[in-house]
């Protein structure tokens, strides 16, 4: 972060971390204090004339504060709600000053790029997505945990070689990438090279690197409902499309899972998805439909079975 500050001429940085992570908070406090003691932070760092310091700010765990403008609003001491853009943070951000925001993974790459050179970093990955990506691998998989892979690695390699495959002899059914707002990727796309563009093209996204594996016993309608329940709870309520739209979508999904829906409900659900994508204020509402749209795209037969046959094909 200090390197980024030097590059753009900033003198103050903030690390925003959830208060529910006390170990992370404690370690960051120690690291910041040690950096000050070593002269890596503060006034006139190494007699360079460059001043830079870092403050730690704790968040209350709101999912919407992962959106950059809501995060800045929270750091300022206000309720974490997104702001309209423009103006963009690079022109008018934290405390009305020009601001850049990056996640920890981005900053962690900077020292290695400086030490090894940009060519080294660009030698990994794909043409448009350079370097590596860290995924949190979980779900119905033998080996769970954090895995770092070069961009362009296939989903099959992650699931079968790194993750050790699906346990108990079950078949792979889908993987959801990008956290609660990501899409579900079916087995037909197991061999697609993972990068930002490819994930978007098949209805998912990279996000911060969540990767959840599902087996043949997973009900994809239940999965869509599960993630939408989370989004409903985490919506800040500032804009109507997200505040009301997600609730209407959840009501329809509940009818479908109970065998009480009609095919007209399915059409309405899809219509609401596109409405949220187009009209929500921030990325939380814009991406909330991804789990629904991706499961409709690849597992529509399961929705129809719930509606017509009043039962779940996955059991």
Give short role names for the model-derived ranges.
Residues 22, 139, 172-192:
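Short acidic beta-strand-loop surface patches of small beta-rich interaction domains
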Residues 2-4, 151-167:
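Short amphipathic, charge-patterned alpha-helical segments
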Residues 20-25, 62-65, 71, 79, ...:
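Flexible loop/turn segments at secondary-structure boundaries
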Residues 11-13, 17-21, 26-48, 188-315:
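Ferredoxin-type iron-sulfur electron-transfer modules in oxidoreductases and energy-metabolism complexes
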Residues 2-19, 167-173, 246:
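Glycine-rich phosphate/pyrophosphate-binding loops
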Residues 14-18, 48-57, 171-178, 267-268:
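Beta-strand segments within the central parallel beta-sheet cores of soluble alpha/beta enzyme folds
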Residues 25-151, 163:
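Hydrophobic alpha-helical positions that pack around
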């Amino acid at each position: 972060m200090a390197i980024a500050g030097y590059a753009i001429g900033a003198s103050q940085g903030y690390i925003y971390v959830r208060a529910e992570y006390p170990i992370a908070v404690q370690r960051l406090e120690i690291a910041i204090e040690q950096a000050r003691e070593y002269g890596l932070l503060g006034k006139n760092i190494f007699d360079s004339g460059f001043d830079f310091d870092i403050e730690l700010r704790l968040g209350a765990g709101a999912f919407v504060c992962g959106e950059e403008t809501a995060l800045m609003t929270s750091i300022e001491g206000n309720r974490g709600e997104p702001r309209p853009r423009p103006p963009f943070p690079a022109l008018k951000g934290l405390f009305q000053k020009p601001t850049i925001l990056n996640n920890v993974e981005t900053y962690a790459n900077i020292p290695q790029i400086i030490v090894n050179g940009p060519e080294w970093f660009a030698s990994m990955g794909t043409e448009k997505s350079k370097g590596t990506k860290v995924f949190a691998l979980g779900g119905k998989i033998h080996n769970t945990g954090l895995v770092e892979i070069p961009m362009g690695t296939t989903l099959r390699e992650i699931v079968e070689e790194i993750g050790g495959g699906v346990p108990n002899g079950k078949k792979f059914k889908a993987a959801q990438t990008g956290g609660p707002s990501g899409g579900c990727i079916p087995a037909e796309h197991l061999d697609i090279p993972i990068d930002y563009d490819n994930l978007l093209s098949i209805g998912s996204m990279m996000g911060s690197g969540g990767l959840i594996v599902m087996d043949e016993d997973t009900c994809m309608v239940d999965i869509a409902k599960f993630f939408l329940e989370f989004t409903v709870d985490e919506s800040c309520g500032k804009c109507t499309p997200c505040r009301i739209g997600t609730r209407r979508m959840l009501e329809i999904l509940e009818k479908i899972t109970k065998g009480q829906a009609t095919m007209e409900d399915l059409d309405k659900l899809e219509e609401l998805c596109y409405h949220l994508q187009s009209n929500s204020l921030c990325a939380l509402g814009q991406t909330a439909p991804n789990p629904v749209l991706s499961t409709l795209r690849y597992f529509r037969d399961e929705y129809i079975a719930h509606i017509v046959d009043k039962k779940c094909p996955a059991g």
